[in-house]
Regions:
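Shared catalytic-loop signature of beta/alpha-barrel
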Residues: 1-87
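C-terminal extensions of enzymes
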Residues: 74-113
């Protein structure tokens, strides 16, 4: 109502997950405010979740701020994300289309002191 923003940017983690992000996108759309989704740095799973949620709304501007998959040398998912061309084809698999690599989860788990 106050016309205090033309565009809103947030990441799924900041929003509180996919359901909360969907609600925020709907609220922004109702206020005629465009949305940019991105996290600056994240791994494959969070990046794919943001890509998938961004693809569900015409109110989300094209392009995500997601450089994590371009900069990491390893990931905890079995699938890789190639966004080096600036675009990708959405998966037809269930959920976000990724599975976790249990051995990588063990390898990178924070060890208790």
């Amino acid at each position: 109502k106050a016309d205090c923003a033309d565009i809103v940017k947030f990441g799924l983690t900041q929003a509180g997950g996919m359901t909360a992000a969907s609600r925020m996108i709907a609220s922004a759309e109702a206020a005629n405010v465009k949305v940019v989704i991105g996290h600056g740095f994240g791994l494959n799973l969070s990046t794919m979740a943001e890509i998938m949620i961004g693809a569900t709304s015409n109110n989300v501007l094209p392009g995500l701020e997601c450089v994590g998959p371009l900069k990491v040398t390893d990931t905890v998912t079995n699938e890789q994300i190639d966004i080096s061309s600036g675009e990708m084809t959405l998966t037809e698999k269930i959920g976000v289309g990724m599975t976790l690599d249990e051995s990588k989860l063990s390898k990178y788990a924070l060890k208790t002191l």
